[in-house]
Amino acid sequence: MRTHYCGAVTAADVGNTVTLCGWAHRRRDHGGVIFIDLRDREGMVQVVVDPDTPAAFKLAEDVRAEFVLKIEGKVRPRPAGTENPHLPTGMVEVLTLDLDVLNPSLTPPFQIDDETINENIRLQYRYLDLRREPMQKNLKLRYRVSKIMRDYLDTHGFMEVETPMLTRSTPEGARDYLVPSRVHDGMFYALPQSPQLFKQLLMVSGVDRYFQITKCFRDEDLRADRQPEFTQVDLETSFMGEEAIMGLVEGMIRDMMQKAQGIELPAAFPRMSYAEAMNRYGSDKPDLRVTLEIVDVGDVMRDVAFKVFATPANDPKGRVAALRIPGGATLSRSEIDGYTEFVKIYGAKGLAYIKVNDVGQLNEAGLQSPIVKNLSEAALHAVMERTGAQNGDLIFFGADRAKVVNDALGALRLKIGHEKGHVDGRAWAPLWVVDFPMFEYNEDENRWDALHHPFTAPKDGHEDWLATDPGKCLSKAYDMVLNGWEVGGGSVRIHREKVQEKVFAALNIGEEERREKFGFLLDALQYGAPPHGGLAFGLDRLVTLMAGAESIRDVIAFPKTQRASCLMTNAPNVVDEKQLRELHIRLRNPIAADKAA
């Protein structure tokens, strides 16, 4: 139907006849000549319809926004002074010879180029929202990113293998989406949270190098960077250790970002242990572009009169830490109050601070704060020395359980760093976070939980602690972090059945439960399972970062809202009683039951 995309018409086509198809973006009537900006996925070109083609002119008079048009015309230079250097096609226009309205359009609920549209309206009319240039760019970038990674993995000997979407429910840290079985009364499938166990079984099968770009599902509370269904670039390989796997996927990300957007990442990503990341940045996914750092001061606060500091300083699970803000003494009282309210989101009870007016006077004459009188000179000296405080700085303090302090000061570090310009100017700051603990203690249930998942291998020499002191065990896990986002995570897996049994025991998973939920894996590990490991990248997160999008929803064609609903199709929805009977399901909620009747 067409010879060219609208956005592909250039000065090289001057004098040629072209056929274009697209949407009427804008129509203007100037002194008896009609101008139509015709748009398709590749861009826009100006079309001119004059009375010398009366049939086309008559049709053009009735054209409105978003009509679908087919236009045959001759490419000519724009008249001098009317060129548009901001448009790739801005040096030419198409003089219409023939016009056909392929389909009219209702008046759209918003202008396609309106950047202030309410997101709910955008999601309700997603098929119109996707016509907008930013959304088209995001979809193209997403496709290019996935294609480059697929090509890279193919070049490195990986084979794409599909794994099941209907599987069994196994605990992986979030709630499963359950699918009732019609033929197995009272039984359910689960949609996979990841292909984790299947890709390990593929390694046992001798596939050697596997990858898949696949949908995963988690029934969890949503945030800006989460969706109930999301896309993973998933890979697994046999006979490779941590360093080899990290090197391979680091090369993939470097290759992809260079080819997709011309971004040059460093030749080798820095490495940082989990413990160091938490200590210095309060997060296991630190944004290294922010120059502010958290400093421990708990050891010098154990004997101070200020109980807010002394109590957590003497608690093995507590932490007292400081965050220096260069030039922060100029912060107003209202700004400090705002930051105090901000950290309360993360469980902090408040936010103590000291304004440094004269670092040489370790008393109320040189340090402005109601807490100074309750701190010893030795403690104040240690704080000033460790933080590197200078005159005009401000020091914030966190004092609570270690998790609260890390969460609160870690978030505050990012907020102030970006708001006040405490960044180093880099556009991209990748790193690997390594040496994660195997387990974290669940105080509510008085048990150990796997920090990543229960199939992660312990560090060499740590296996013996699984039974005696699980908290000391470190794992062969690694996360790739980019600008404060975890874009990928993986590990070397357990390939020996006896070690897997020990990990299940440390997690208080009894023998009967192990066999019921993971018997197939334990059996497979006894049939010559090779050493193996892998990693999964969140494609949605990665593209969001690269696109500079505000939300992950902006890089997904048909996303769900933060309430896990689709405003366009009204999913989820009720189903009729006949369908429920076939699935052997009766609704206990009377409202839902009435709707289904």
UniProtKB/Swiss-Prot annotation:
GO biological process: aspartyl-tRNA aminoacylation
Keywords: Aminoacyl-tRNA synthetase, ATP-binding, Cytoplasm, Ligase, Nucleotide-binding, Protein biosynthesis
Gene Ontology terms: cellular component: cytoplasm
A Pfam family assignment: tRNA_anti-codon
Reaction catalysis annotation: tRNA(Asx) + L-aspartate + ATP = L-aspartyl-tRNA(Asx) + AMP + diphosphate
EC number(s) reported in the record: 6.1.1.23
Subcellular location: Cytoplasm
Principal location listed in the UniProt entry: cytoplasm
Keyword Aminoacyl-tRNA synthetase: yes
Top-rank taxon: Bacteria
Enzyme class: ligase
Keyword NAD: no
Region of interest (Aspartate), residue spans: 196-199
Annotated residues for binding of L-aspartate: E172, R218, H452, R493
Positions annotated to bind ATP: R218, D219, E220, Q227, E486, G538, L539, D540, R541
Site feature: Important for tRNA non-discrimination: H30, G81
Subunit structure: Homodimer.
Function: Aspartyl-tRNA synthetase with relaxed tRNA specificity since it is able to aspartylate not only its cognate tRNA(Asp) but also tRNA(Asn). Reaction proceeds in two steps: L-aspartate is first activated by ATP to form Asp-AMP and then transferred to the acceptor end of tRNA(Asp/Asn).
HAMAP family: Asp_tRNA_synth_type1
Family: Belongs to the class-II aminoacyl-tRNA synthetase family. Type 1 subfamily.
Protein name: Aspartate--tRNA(Asp/Asn) ligase
Organism: Thiobacillus denitrificans (strain ATCC 25259 / T1)
Gene: aspS
